[in-house]
Amino acid sequence: LSAPIRRGQFDPSHIDLRNLLSKLSIKALSEDSVNISIKRLGFDEQSGFSLNRLQFKFEANRQQARLSDFKIQLPHSRIEIKPIIATLPDTLSAEHFYDQTRFSLQITKSLINPSDIAAFIPVLEKINTPILISMHLTGTPNNLYFHTFDFNFGKEDIIAHSQISVKNITNPQKRDILCDPITLNASSSGLTDIASKLPFLTEEQCKTISRLGTIHFTGNISSQNKNLTACGTLKTDLGSVHS
């Protein structure tokens, strides 16, 4: 608590909620059964983060858990998740939970404005262009497979489509991410707009990105032990590269 407050950033040591609104219903809460409805939760936090509305219904017993009616509204964002049903392991130890709890999750056309979450990721503060995201994933908390992942920045300024596998999520040393296949299209104006709003890029780096013009990439991207590898064909206004 003696640490100085980090203004403009979420600080877990100095949480300050204002304009708190909440409405919830607890129908069951025991070792064998849970039935909770958050009908509305909203607040403003000193970091600048505002939660306009969070709502969901959570039901669970020893065999399965169900999350439904899940919606999040931020000042310029809205996220909706289709009902999730998770099958639980017989033994709820941490290892069994992460490796044996199976579920399916779908997000359809949710809108996210990066500046809404700048309190957690400060570099997004100046990016006000909306992102449309859709995905369908299945798996366990430790191993996920995205059957579809669609990303649309602005008015199709940057578009990405991919199938993604993420393995060993709980073990950073063994974590493995593979996007295969992935297709990425980015317009010159879209890249220039983002680059100009990222504080860690120098003016010269922004000019270099601008000179690339329109970008098209097809192939795969993998990440393991902090090593990022891309294989495929990259086409820009300056030429093409194949690896």
Label the model's feature ranges.
Residues L1-F153, T170-H242:
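Extended amphipathic, helix-rich lipid-handling scaffolds
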Residues Q163:
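Conserved two-metal-ion catalytic palm core of "right-hand" nucleic acid polymerases
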Residues V166:
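C-terminal, active-site-flanking charged/polar segments
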